[in-house]
Amino acid sequence: MDYFTFFGLPARYQLDTQALSLRFQDLQRQYHPDKFASGSQAEQLAAVQQSATINQAWQTLRHPLMRAEYLLSLHGFDLASEQHTVRDTAFLMEQLELREELDEIEQAKDEARLESFIKRVKKMFDTRHQLMVEQLDNEAWDAAADTVRKLRFLDKLRSSAEQLEEKLLDF
């Protein structure tokens, strides 16, 4: 059973996050291992496994990029283990330039430039994210998979920039 079905939700990218949260809480209560403490060893093990599945499904569906990757996996795209890389050379060059810029910002310890950089990367991410949403809605799986690969780069870059921001603030 896929995670969407497990949570009683349609298998699509855009979902009702409130319904997801409520269903998660219901499933947690229903299958919490403590409820099976007096049960047989097999029942206890099954409860622990079910609880782990609930938590994994919850983590996957609540995180937008993970949810997109999971939805694509249901359509034959195993992005988590695939060896496909982004073949868009212009995008890759842009990523290299952005990484170099982030390194320069770190060397200069330039907080104002870093703030501007983070905003720019967030805007780039948001633009591509919206494109991905449209591609998934239109079931353009190949295009969506390519966009998700690019979003991974941007997500890592954003994370690196935010870590640098914390480092500079602690300095």
From Swiss-Prot:
<dbReference type="InterPro" id="IPR036869">
    <property type="entry name" value="J_dom_sf"/>
</dbReference>
<dbReference type="InterPro" id="IPR001623">
    <property type="entry name" value="DnaJ_domain"/>
</dbReference>
<dbReference type="GO" id="GO:1990230">
    <property type="term" value="C:iron-sulfur cluster transfer complex"/>
</dbReference>
<dbReference type="GO" id="GO:0044571">
    <property type="term" value="P:[2Fe-2S] cluster assembly"/>
</dbReference>
<dbReference type="GO" id="GO:0001671">
    <property type="term" value="F:ATPase activator activity"/>
</dbReference>
<dbReference type="GO" id="GO:0006457">
    <property type="term" value="P:protein folding"/>
</dbReference>
<dbReference type="GO" id="GO:0051087">
    <property type="term" value="F:protein-folding chaperone binding"/>
</dbReference>
<protein>
    <recommendedName>
        <fullName>Co-chaperone protein HscB</fullName>
    </recommendedName>
</protein>
<dbReference type="Pfam" id="PF07743">
    <property type="entry name" value="HSCB_C"/>
</dbReference>
<comment type="function">
    <text>Co-chaperone involved in the maturation of iron-sulfur cluster-containing proteins. Seems to help targeting proteins to be folded toward HscA.</text>
</comment>
<comment type="subunit">
    <text>Interacts with HscA and stimulates its ATPase activity. Interacts with IscU.</text>
</comment>
<dbReference type="InterPro" id="IPR036386">
    <property type="entry name" value="HscB_C_sf"/>
</dbReference>
<dbReference type="GO" id="GO:0051259">
    <property type="term" value="P:protein complex oligomerization"/>
</dbReference>
<dbReference type="InterPro" id="IPR004640">
    <property type="entry name" value="HscB"/>
</dbReference>
<dbReference type="InterPro" id="IPR009073">
    <property type="entry name" value="HscB_oligo_C"/>
</dbReference>
<comment type="similarity">
    <text>Belongs to the HscB family.</text>
</comment>
<feature type="domain" description="J">
    <location>
        <begin position="2"/>
        <end position="74"/>
    </location>
</feature>
<keyword id="KW-0143">Chaperone</keyword>
